[in-house]
Structure formats: C-alpha cells, structure tokens
UniProtKB/Swiss-Prot annotation:
SMART domains: SH3b
NCBIfam families: SH3_and_anchor (TIGR04211)
Entries under InterPro entries matching the protein: SH3-like_bac-type, SH3_dom_pro
Source species of the chain: Escherichia coli (strain K12)
SH3b domain location: 23-89
Cellular location(s): Membrane
UniProt protein name: Uncharacterized protein YgiM
Amino acid sequence: MPKLRLIGLTLLALSATAVSHAEETRYVSDELNTWVRSGPGDHYRLVGTVNAGEEVTLLQTDANTNYAQVKDSSGRTAWIPLKQLSTEPSLRSRVPDLENQVKTLTDKLTNIDNTWNQRTAEMQQKVAQSDSVINGLKEENQKLKNELIVAQKKVDAASVQLDDKQRTIIMQWFMYGGGVLGLGLLLGLVLPHLIPSRKRKDRWMN
C-alpha cells in the first residue's frame, strides 16, 4: 500500500509538471478548419473542429504532447495542437479591420485634400482680390497725379495772367499819375499868366 501510494503521488507530480495551467486568449491558425480532440494527444478521439481565426481561451498546455486545452465561444472544451494556436489574430480576421483602417485613413486623406483645395482656392481668390485692389489704387494714384499736373499747369497759367494784369494795372496807374502830374504842371505854368492879365484888364476898364 505505501508503495502504491508513493507511485500514485509520483505520477500526479509528473502530470502536474507536464501540464501547465493558464487561461489566456489564443487564436486558431488560418487553416480552413482545425480538428480538436478529447485529450492531449493524437491518439485521442476527434470531437469536432474550430474555425480558422476563431478566438479561443487557453486553459492549459501539455509539454509532453505539445497540445493545449482550449475553450471556444460556445463553451466547448477540447484539445488542439499548440502549433495551431497564435497569440495574434489571424490574417483572415484582421483583413476587415485593416480594410476599415484603410477606408478611415482614405476618408481622412480625402477630407484633408478637400480642405486643402478649398483653402488654396480661398487664398487664390483673396490674392486675386488683393491684386485687383492694388491695381485700382495704382490707377487712382496715377489719375490723381495727372489731375495734380493739370491743376499745377492751370495755377502756373493763372499766375502768369495775374502777373500780366498786375503789370498792366501798374502801368495804367503810372500813366494816369503821369498825366495828372503833367496836367498839374501845365496848369501851374499857364494859370499864373492868365490870372494877372485879367486883373490888368479889369483895372483898365475901371
């Protein structure tokens, strides 16, 4: 009895050493389907299949047979070769996610491109408007310059005419002044001779 008990304990220890327990997430490989068995080895009977890329829960592994006990989404427990499991999702299951990511990125790039084109068009329109305003200001400035030149010519012509009129008026005043002065001198010379002669005539008549 003690020997049998010792042998039993030894077998339990060996089995505990050979099988490791750990509940982790694993993914079935990309093969069309994978057979699962009722125990950790090829000699155990087949109990069904799991789909490629299916997510399963790793319950334990057997290092001697390289089998793993898994539980699928329906709660079924079976054994599957370790090489048929992966820590990463299968390519088949990741394709839709990758396609969605590509679509999302494509939409973002399209939006960025549309926004950039819109902003570029707005900037070009603003530049065109600015050029139009600048050209208008240049034309207005040139127009004002031309008007200033014309006004300056008119001022110069008016100044010349004013100078001529002033000279004419001055000459006329000189002429009038000279005439009055000459007449005064003439009267000053003639009147003294005329007045005494009248006095003498008056005396003779008396």
